[in-house]
Amino acid sequence: MEKKMTFENVTKDELLKTAKVPIRVVETEADIYEDMATVMFEEIVRNNEAGRNTVFIVPVGPIGQYRVLAGKVNAAHTDLSNVYFFNMDEYLDDNNNPIPPEHPLSFYGFMSREWYDLVNMPVENRWYPISGK
């Protein structure tokens, strides 16, 4: 009987051979963030050069890529005027209002501290879900 491949028992070689989407294997967690930031940065640069907007739908996790991306953007003086971030979600309180930005679980607060406050990205290009709308 053939052993069923599961997350717990799949080897790197099996995963790479059977994956239905492109996969890159990196050595460390820091490498993941560097890779994600590099992919995002290159997309921004490529679209800027072509005169196109860049649109990302971004989660709050994983989290390490945002500061790395900010470093790349700032080092290269990259224009973010045509870059749009659609933030995926936000926690609500018991009254269905977004939790305050200073709350440790606030996506808005996290993204402000780890990305928006570090770069020159227009406020109107930052989108968050609004409860009830």
Describe each model-derived feature in a short phrase.
Residues M1-F56, N74:
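N-terminal glycine-/serine-/threonine-rich phosphate-binding loop
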Residues M5-K20, D31, D79-K133:
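Ligand-binding beta-strand-loop-alpha-helix segment within the catalytic cores
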Residues I32, G64-Q65:
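Short phosphate-engaging motifs
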Residues D35, V39, V68, F110, ...:
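Alpha-helical scaffold segments in soluble metabolic enzymes
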